[in-house]
Amino acid sequence: MPRPMKWRKVCCLPESNRFGPLDLNAGDQNQVKMTVDEYETIRLIDLEGFTQEECAKKMNVARTTVQGIYIEARKKLAESLVNGKVLQIEGGEYRLCDGLGNGCGQGCYKRRRRMGCSGKEEGED
């Protein structure tokens, strides 16, 4: 019997889920797909400055799982930037945090409603 799915906890969805060259036709060969949980590891580790261990606790998974997700996310990000491909963020094995869970002292739900993932108040540049 297979092991049950362990969902990765994600604080908030990206404000934009598509990035890339403005003049490119986004066919399948010109597109890189990144999952929402891969995006979350990039956000937590590279933007927020968390260690892989801290990221793992926030996402409710093992550090080795975060390491694998992070490696794949960086490969996809590099492929998009270096080869001029559109980066599409969608899907993945995640559940959106309600801000009430164990270890969620950041108030994800309230923060998401007020600021979004960028950490900026709405209308702030």
From Swiss-Prot:
InterPro entries, A to Z: RNA_pol_sigma_r3/r4-like, UPF0251, WH-like_DNA-bd_sf
Taxonomy of the source species: Bacteria, Bacillati, Bacillota, Clostridia, Eubacteriales
Protein name: UPF0251 protein DSY3441
Source organism: Desulfitobacterium hafniense (strain Y51)
Similarity comment: family membership: Belongs to the UPF0251 family.
Matching Pfam families: DUF134 (PF02001)
Extent of the signal sequence: none
